């Protein structure tokens, strides 16, 4: 008898099996994109000096915790490329898809991504220490460093500031600078409704109080997880120095009283 090799034919996949494979592949691709975004965010922290190599694993695990994830697979390459806004968008979208981020609106996305950025932030005491060490060298070096930190931390959102509209116009009183600030997000209807239903809180007492440092925020109060203040002493009283997150003008800074008292402008 003549010998033949019998090669079994591949059975055709059912529609459901085919769809399951597609879904599985998409899930793997989606997970890989999230891992790349996490790696990209850690890389961003390293590149900006927010963290050091010794902090990288800790920062990654903190990000995983905020994302509601309990595992991580190291992706190939340097991580997700692009600016900070693009990296955060991937993480925010995934958090909403998995139900970790309940509402997909600018108010709630801002509350959430501020938690992510805090994973890269030094403690307030470390910021204060580094500021005054630089101040001994040069006050300008100290304030330049602090301003950069305020931007790198995404407390000042560079990608929104550049959208602000600015121009000058001549008036009978002189040249007038006009700014339309687009970096301060408007509340969406859901956030407004949630703020009305929420229990009224008197903490922090205002958006400038010292107690804002590290505050997670809520629908009617911005997140300040990534906010750091430099304590200063003026006339034997405690004050705070910070930059404005909305930058109404170049290096817009604020000095405020350490106590919550009515503002009085006099001589």
PLM features: residue spans?
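Short, positively charged and aromatic/hydrophobic N-terminal segments
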Residues: 3-24
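Active-site microenvironments that recognize anionic phosphate/pyrophosphate groups
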Residues: 29-263
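Long, well-ordered alpha-helical scaffolding segments within enzyme catalytic domains
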Residues: 265-267
